[in-house]
Amino acid sequence: STLFPYTTLFRSDIGCISEAHHYAKEVATGHLPFLLTSCCPSWSVMAKKYFPAMIDNISQELTPMVATARIVKKEHPHAKVVFIGPCASKKLEAMRHSVRSDVDFVITFEELWGLFDAKSITPSTCEELPEETQAATAAGRGYAIAGGVAGAIENCLKEYYPDVPVHIEHAESLAECKKVLTLAKAGKIKNCMIEGMACPGGCIGGAGTNAGFAKTSKALKKYVDGSEPKLPSQELENLELN
């Protein structure tokens, strides 16, 4: 069998440029009072469960995991797709009827480390696979930290829609997310993009991580700061991944 490594970062780039377009088209024109991000499955599930009237305000953009999986299945129809990351909630997302044919398995970093340990595999001694050819921008690479999605969308709006006023809110932890949604429901937060992340600190603070937040956030910042270009091309909003 052949292993094809893919990252979800390029799909994050597509997502942030599409979200910026959606914000400019729907929120800035008053068609929607606010727009909720959808890349964190726990956040979107909570919003749908406790605030069902807001379902139409949740972005319809595919999550980076699903978008990547669909590209893999298109390029390699018989491939088995395994998503590896710090998020335990991705396991439930992969079980959805609309997703289960795209993502075959989900394992966390912690589980992967356990597999390495059980099989006496030392990653540093293994042959490196070639990186995916489509590199991500700093915007896509910053998705994993709280405020990263909102920040990427905000920067895209300022670059490509300079005449559109930008109002961004973000919350981390489900308790804070619920507070923000309660305020939005009451009309106290409006005309904005709202990013929600279930895990404090964002994805890098996920339940399945195998490293401390201080270490991972520092590494991510270095990774983002060293990335070029900083923003995805506006042309990406025309890509169809559905």
Description of each model-found segment:
Residues 1, 5-242:
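Iron-sulfur-associated redox domains of electron-transfer enzymes in respiratory
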